[in-house]
């Protein structure tokens, strides 16, 4: 074998090694490398089933926000895979199918049926089959078990939300739930809670008792109740008579309804007691004396209503609104305080009116979101605010008038001077002064009329007054928002308030009497026949045509009676209509309609559905009372919000003035008055008015038409045209004609005195000061007072003690922070008071402190005067500052003259009285702190015992005693008493 040499170079060393190469056959073959092994293959194989299920899972979120998988079952996964394979197979077959074009569609390759035979046209159906099916309603019937289950569910809902349930049997029983004795319990309304004292305080039948047994079983029904636990305010509470401990009276049916206590014994409201027990029993209703006075006189003084009253407003909200009304009309710190009442009575009329306006405005703001529920309170406060709004009286105009004619006392200058004085007094004028002013205005009008006599006489033969053939465009009857789907007018709320007309001035048609009993309409000088009998339509055409002719009544031709003129010119709306030849247009037969208001004088008349009355019977105006249809037509143009006020004004103001058979002038005058209150009625269309010159009567045509024909027709077709009759300068005979009347069956119309007509609203100095004292030691209350009534700060100058107490509590600093960006004048007042408190604290005597305060009144008054302001206490603050300023100026003058004015004893008595009020507030604050402290100690004991073992009770009692002694002090006379009280509680 050959030997070869191989050279290996290692650095600088060269090494030669011999070697023999191996033969070719012995060379090792190439080694095959095995496949790569995945270390996670086994893990993936184990998790493949889980991942496969996770692929079909959905994600859901738990209540705490954690997202997790919701896995499908094996059956669901199989169904999903099967549907997926079917969709893939269908898609594949569709994609691989050969393309095709549909060019013709036949039935089995034959001809269409339309070519095989001719179509035979059958009879045409001219009617549409009825598609709607009649619905039948079954009366729900409940078994005894279902009824009990329903009562149980209602009880659970109402007891949770503090609602109420009404049980209706022979009489209604109202059950409400409130928290009593630590749980929600059922409460019924007893007689003494309504202000009535009866020997049996609560009565109910057996059915009601059974229902009360179910409704009263609330949570903690079986808890034991002691007689000493019951307090005032627990009247009517239903308790279990088997769980009572103490001196209780007799009860039955497993229920005990709390009434009151007599000689330590609690009586059931269903028990009949003697007269002596009833008189001496202590009722458990809160504020019993107050409600006795209120409820005892409420029923006697309330006014009759035209509806059935229901309790639809929560009592708590009513109480809050009553508080708003009281503080808006008669503000006081205590309603029983005679000083508040006297100070209110001593206010000048001008100041009272200003404060009334301000308090009414603040009352509306306090009402807030409840304005929609308490619309009557909103309306009253709005009217009060409007009536007491300050009038801008110009003294310059008064002086100019007085300089011109002040010394002249003859007419008409005397009347002008009276009006000048009247305008200067503004809203302080009395009713007598209003009457004198109106008489003076009447005298001036007569003087002007007599002075300008320019009445001209014209020739009646040339008089023409054609009736327009075009109908008036009534926007209110054309607006889509006021029409239903059949284009009929929607009365809305006006329909409800129109019942004041129907109940007082209309009567129902009695079908038993027949229509003939209502055909003749009586008036002072004759009769007019209605077409009400034509509601019975004869089917004979000749008879029908005969009835359509009517009964003709001849009227005189066109004369001076038919015209009205002013300043020699005709007032055409106040005249009778004529034809082209000058002859009068005579009325024809007007057919009757059912339950319609017929309006419009020109063109085609308009028929408006009458508002629904109290029944479905037909209504007709009472004898001599047809002019109410004019006010009913005006109601169409009244908005739904003003409908109530409009109908009341017509009932209480217009109708009593018109009296029986008013003249056209009086009717027009009342319409003019209503137009001032409601301007939208100026274009209200009127019913057709017929003029009877023979009897000097104007007839207002209603829905029953007129059988009598031949009357003249008045051209006036709207309220604005009818108002033209209300003019003394109008020369017209028609304005003195009679129209309609008032029924004698409405004696209540004379009783229109409002119970709210007297009284007013003012924040007196005493009430404002008490309100300020209430918040000195209550930061939250004071913050709210500063936001609502910042001018309460001014009243702190009445007492140096109050001023320094407010400074020490940081109230002035808080006021500056609250108002520095809103109203800088209030922030300046707070800064001045803060500086004043520092100077007062440096004074050594009370008299010196008062002198410092009185001296600063001028600067405070200059900073406070800020024009018109809506805050309740703004006028009070100005009045206080003005009094202090004037007193300081007078005292300064007397002091310079050598007469010292300050009486040390008087100042000390005043300060002592105000300081006592401040101390009482602080005592109440401390008492509240003690109560809270005791409650915390008792609650901590309960929590301690619930967590720790019972044998540690003694140690805990010693700790509590030590804490109590540390708080109250070892020498505190009440310390031992408090310790004993807490130990007993433990």
From Swiss-Prot:
The keyword Transport is annotated on this UniProt entry: yes
Ranges for domain Peptidase S30: 141-284
RNA-binding found in the keyword field: no
Matching Pfam families: Peptidase_C6, Peptidase_S30, Potyvirid-P3
InterPro entries: HC-pro (IPR001456), HC_PRO_CPD_dom (IPR031159), HC_PRO_CPD_sf (IPR042308), Pept_S30_P1_potyvir (IPR002540), Potyvirid-P3 (IPR039560)
Family, per entry: Belongs to the potyviridae P3N-PIPO polyprotein family.
Protein's name in the database: P3N-PIPO polyprotein
Organism: Potato virus Y (strain Hungarian) (PVY)
Lineage: Viruses, Riboviria, Orthornavirae, Pisuviricota, Stelpaviricetes
């Amino acid at each position: 074998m050959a030997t070869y040499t191989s050279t290996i170079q290692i650095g600088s060393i060269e090494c030669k090694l011999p070697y023999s190469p191996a033969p070719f056959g012995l060379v090792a073959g190439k080694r095959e490398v095995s496949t790569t092994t995945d270390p996670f293959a086994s893990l993936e194989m184990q998790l493949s089933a889980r991942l496969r299920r996770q692929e079909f899972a959905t994600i859901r979120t738990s209540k705490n926000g954690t997202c997790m998988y919701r896995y499908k079952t094996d059956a669901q996964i199989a169904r999903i895979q099967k549907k997926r394979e079917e969709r893939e197979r269908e898609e594949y077959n569709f994609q691989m199918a050969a393309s095709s074009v549909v060019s013709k569609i036949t039935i089995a390759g034959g001809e269409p049926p339309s070519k095989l035979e001719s179509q035979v046209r059958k009879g045409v159906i001219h009617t549409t089959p009825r598609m709607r099916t009649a619905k039948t309603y079954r009366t729900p019937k409940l078994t005894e078990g279902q009824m009990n289950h329903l009562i149980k569910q209602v009880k659970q809902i109402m007891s949770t939300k503090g609602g109420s349930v009404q049980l209706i049997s022979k009489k209604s029983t109202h059950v409400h739930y409130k928290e009593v004795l630590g749980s929600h319990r059922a409460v019924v309304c007893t007689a003494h809670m309504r202000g009535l004292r009866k020997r049996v305080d609560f009565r109910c039948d057996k059915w009601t008792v059974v229902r009360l047994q179910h409704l009263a079983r609330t949570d903690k029904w079986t808890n034991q109740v002691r007689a000493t636990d019951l307090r005032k305010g627990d009247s009517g509470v239903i308790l279990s008579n088997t769980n009572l401990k103490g001196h209780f009276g007799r009860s039955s049916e497993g229920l005990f309804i709390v009434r009151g206590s007599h000689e330590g014994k609690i009586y059931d409201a269903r028990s009949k007691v003697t007269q002596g027990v009833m008189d001496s029993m202590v009722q458990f209703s809160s504020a019993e004396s107050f409600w006795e006075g209120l409820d005892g006189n409420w029923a006697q003084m309330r006014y009759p209503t035209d509806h059935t009253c229901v309790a639809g407003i929560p009592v708590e909200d009513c109480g809050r609104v009553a508080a708003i009304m009281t503080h808006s009309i008669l503000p006081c710190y205590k309603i029983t305080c005679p000083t508040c009442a006297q100070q209110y009575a001593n206010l000048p009329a001008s100041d009272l009116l200003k404060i009334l306006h301000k308090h009414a405005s603040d009352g509306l703001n306090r009402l807030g979101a409840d304005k929609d529920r308490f619309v009557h309170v909103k309306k009253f406060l709005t009217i009060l605010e409007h009536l007491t709004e300050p009038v801008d009286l110009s003294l310059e105009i008064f002086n100019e008038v007085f300089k011109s004619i002040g010394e002249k006392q003859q007419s008409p200058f005397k009347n002008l001077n009276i009006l000048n004085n009247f305008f200067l007094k503004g809203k302080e004028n009395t009713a007598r002064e209003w009457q004198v002013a109106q008489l003076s205005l009447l005298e001036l009008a007569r003087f002007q009329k007599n002075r300008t006599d320019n009445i001209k006489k014209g020739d009646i033969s040339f008089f023409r007054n054609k009736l327009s053939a075009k109908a008036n465009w009534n926007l209110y009857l054309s607006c889509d928002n006021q029409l239903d789907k059949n284009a009929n007018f929607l009365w809305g709320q006006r329909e409800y308030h129109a019942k004041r007309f129907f109940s007082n001035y209309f009567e129902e048609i009695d079908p038993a009497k027949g229509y003939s009993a209502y055909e003749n309409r009586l008036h002072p000088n004759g009769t007019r026949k209605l077409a009400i009998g034509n509601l019975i339509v004869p089917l004979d055409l000749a008879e029908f045509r005969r009835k359509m002719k009517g009964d003709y009544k001849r009227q005189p031709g066109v004369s001076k009676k038919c015209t009205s003129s002013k300043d020699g010119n005709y007032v055409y709306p106040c005249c009778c209509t004529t034809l082209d030849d000058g002859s009068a247009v005579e009325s024809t037969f007007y057919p009757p309609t059912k339950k319609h208001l017929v309006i419009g004088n020109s063109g085609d008349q308009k028929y408006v559905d009458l508002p629904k009355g109290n029944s479905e019977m037909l209504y007709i105006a009472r004898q001599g009372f047809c002019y109410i249809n004019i006010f009913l037509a005006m109601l169409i143009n009244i908005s739904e919000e003003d409908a109530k006020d409009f109908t009341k004004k017509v009932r209480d103001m217009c109708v009593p003035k018109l009296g029986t058979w008013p003249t056209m002038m009086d009717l027009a005058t009342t319409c003019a008055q209503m137009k001032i209150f409601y301007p939208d009625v100026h274009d209200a269309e009127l019913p057709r008015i017929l003029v009877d010159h023979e009897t000097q009567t104007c007839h207002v045509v209603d829905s029953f038409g007129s059988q009598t024909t031949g009357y003249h027709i008045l051209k006036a077709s709207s309220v604005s045209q009818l108002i033209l009759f209300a003019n003394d300068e109008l020369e017209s005979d028609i304005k003195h004609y009679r129209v309609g009347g008032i029924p004698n069956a409405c004696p209540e119309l004379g009783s229109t005195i409002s119970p709210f007509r007297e009284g007013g609203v003012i924040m007196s100095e005493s009430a404002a000061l008490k309100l300020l004292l209430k918040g000195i030691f209550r930061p939250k209350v004071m913050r709210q007072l500063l936001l609502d009534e910042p001018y309460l700060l001014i009243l702190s100058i009445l007492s140096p003690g109050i001023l320094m107490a407010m400074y020490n509590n940081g109230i002035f600093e808080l006021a500056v922070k609250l108002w520095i960006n809103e109203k800088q004048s209030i922030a300046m007042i707070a800064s001045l008071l803060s500086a004043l408190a520092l100077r007062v604290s440096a004074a050594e005597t009370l008299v010196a402190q008062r002198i410092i305060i009185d001296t600063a009144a001028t600067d405070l008054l200059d900073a406070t005067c800020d024009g018109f302001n809506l805050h309740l206490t703004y006028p009070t603050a100005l009045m206080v500052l003005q009094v202090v300023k004037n007193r300081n100026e007078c005292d300064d003058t007397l002091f310079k003259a050598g007469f010292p004015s300050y009486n040390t004893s008087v100042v000390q008595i005043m300060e002592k009285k105000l300081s006592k009020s401040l101390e009482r507030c602080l005592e109440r604050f401390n008492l509240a702190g003690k109560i809270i402290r005791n409650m915390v100690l008792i609650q901590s004991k309960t929590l301690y015992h619930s967590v720790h073992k019972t044998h540690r009770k003694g140690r805990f009692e010693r700790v509590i005693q030590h804490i109590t002694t540390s708080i109250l002090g070892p020498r505190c006379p009440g310390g031992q008493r408090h310790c004993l009280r807490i130990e007993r509680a433990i």
